Amino acid sequence: MIQQLNIHKLRNLEQVELTLARCNLIIGANGSGKTSLLEAVFLLSRGKSFRHHEPRRYIRHHESDCTIWAKTFGDPSNTLAIQKKLDTQGKSDTLLRFNGQTAASQSVLSFQLPTLLIDPVGMSLLDEGSGTRRQLLDWLVFHMKHEFYQQWLQYQRLLKQRNSLLKQPSIQHRLNELLAWDGQLSYYAHALHEHRQEIFLAWATHFQQMLGLLLPEYQHRLSLQYVAGFDTKNPLIDTLKSRIDQDIELGYTRIGAHRADVSVLFKSTNDQGQKIREQATHILSRGEKKLLITALKLSQLQLICNAISHSNSDATFPVVLIDDIDAELDDAAMQILLRTDRKSVV
């Protein structure tokens, strides 16, 4: 966990140096930079802000760069740093360092500093597109299945190449080339699905347990559902072949692991006595949805902390970032959080 945090030229934080405990409560007036402190940790961990993706939006006004540096508990040489820079045209560049050496990619820092964010914006998770929910699952898989990330990168590279080829005017004369890409894309799609499915099943179990604590009246009516994005019973390459004309017409790949989704279903009975399932977001009140999303995230935290505690790995416990704690967590959720992981930044 973070022992020392230095922030330079991030929003209204010109120069901040903090020594942190394992659990921290940040207080201050509105606009004093409380959320920016959380943003700094998230930026260091994920390489992007949870408020704005464009560096020019969070680099201090009239400055060309911002830097976040952190030292963790344990080995005094264990340090992480990220610098976001703007050139004269406003284009951004990123410099990463781990233990004083240049880091090859953001994944190096992400693995060393996992972060779980609970904030007001995240409470719209159920109403957003599938991408946000897929990222929620993939964050968990990334930290529990370390081979997942390289396979995910390969899939994204192949998908980009396939989509580019689909847009070419000469595509009808390059179908054999497309078939070669499809074979590799299919292989990695099924590999990603296997990892996601395994971790999802464990997550779903912890989610049901968390519902019993936060939304006991709905524990047996709500269920977590994972959709792979393609028919996993058959090779993806066969499905891609059968839909090649539609993909060429659209200019992109409509099915695959990139279309995976996670949703929460609400079980009920209609007037004819038939059992039906609907999206929970259409049924629950705003307050109930907030508790539901809290259950999703705390069940993730519980799962990953339990896995680390029962393993011999050097994996790091997640840092939990909570923006506006009174608004986002009720007393029950706060007690669960403190019991689950006492090594978090809050």
Each language-model region and where it sits:
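Structural recognition of the conserved hydrophobic beta-strand(s) that form the central parallel beta-sheet
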Residues: A70, R342-V346
